[in-house]
């Protein structure tokens, strides 16, 4: 589909397929990662943001802390409306900013790491079987033969790159 999920569901889905999503209802709100100094221009009163530690930050987006005029950057990148006014329909943009959030936001990096740990931890499977399981978990379908070949080539390229640059692998982990 050319239409993507709403901002909150993008986050929840990434956490769910990785096994990190905490589904327990809570009292209060959850504070996921946020860039340092993001609230520095917020006045009346000035505020400091402290992200939750541990599983609390992986609760569903419906429990996320929202500051009315300073929408969480991940939500903003995926066109979530601010709480300043009601909207009947969300805008849908297609910008590189959303892709950059998926690649760099600590929540998504941790979700990718957790998913990779689960897939790689399944003993007795070769790369093709792992790719098939990954597709089923993330896309709810099996991979086409061309997709398997593409991912296998990408995997070989990544392995070679990290073998030559172990500091990059260490930084990612």
Regions found by a protein language model. Give the residues of each.
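An acidic, gly/pro-interrupted, aromatic-rich
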Residues: 1-133, 138, 142, 167, ...
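Extended, well-ordered alpha-helical scaffold/bundle regions in very large, multi-domain proteins
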Residues: 142-148
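Amphipathic alpha-helical segments that form the core helices of the histone-fold
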Residues: 149-160
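Acidic/polar, glycine-enriched structural segments that form the non-catalytic walls/loops
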Residues: 159-163, 171
